[in-house]
Swiss-Prot record:
It comes from Salmonella typhimurium (strain LT2 / SGSC1412 / ATCC 700720). This is Small heat shock protein IbpB. GO terms for biological process: protein stabilization. Residues 26-137 form the sHSP domain. The keyword Chaperone applies.
């Protein structure tokens, strides 16, 4: 019998509570660029990407349907330095996240090498739970 670990596939689904929990419990290494996904409450999430050395104009964020894509293309220096040690990675990247149906991007900021993308879940009223009033008399015996 074979066991397949699907947790790497689940890490980029945002807005699905079970998948968010799997993310928090996952200890697997992340791909470039490193990122965090925060859940502040049931309807607010934040994706933070660490992009040291990138400039705001090097970045592009697109939302197509439920697919959120972040692309980065750093400016290449005219004279490439001769590195003795290069620990900071400056390479082009494209990172995609699949959002839940009712997730919206509410904003993005780039400060001190960190790109923050804020997400909000807007549940339609037909999906939101409804409160039912409890009466003393039966509605059938009116």
């Amino acid at each position: 019998m074979r066991n397949y670990d699907l947790s790497p596939l689940l890490r980029q689904w945002i807005g699905f509570d079970k998948l968010a929990n799997a993310l928090q419990n996952s200890g697997e290494s992340q791909s470039f660029p490193p990122y965090n996904i925060e859940k502040s409450d049931d309807n607010h999430y934040r994706i933070t990407l660490a992009l040291a050395g990138f400039r705001q104009e090097d970045l592009d964020i697109q939302l197509e349907g439920t697919r959120l894509t972040v692309k980065g293309t750093p400016e290449q220096p005219e004279n490439e330095p001769k590195w003795l040690h290069q620990g900071l990675v400056m390479q082009p990247f494209s990172l995609s996240f699949t959002l839940a149906e009712n997730m919206e991007v509410s904003g993005a900021t780039f400060t001190n090498g960190l790109l923050h993308i804020d997400l909000t879940r807007n549940e339609p009223e037909t999906i939101a739970p409804q409160r039912i009033a409890i009466n003393e008399r039966s509605a059938l015996n009116s």
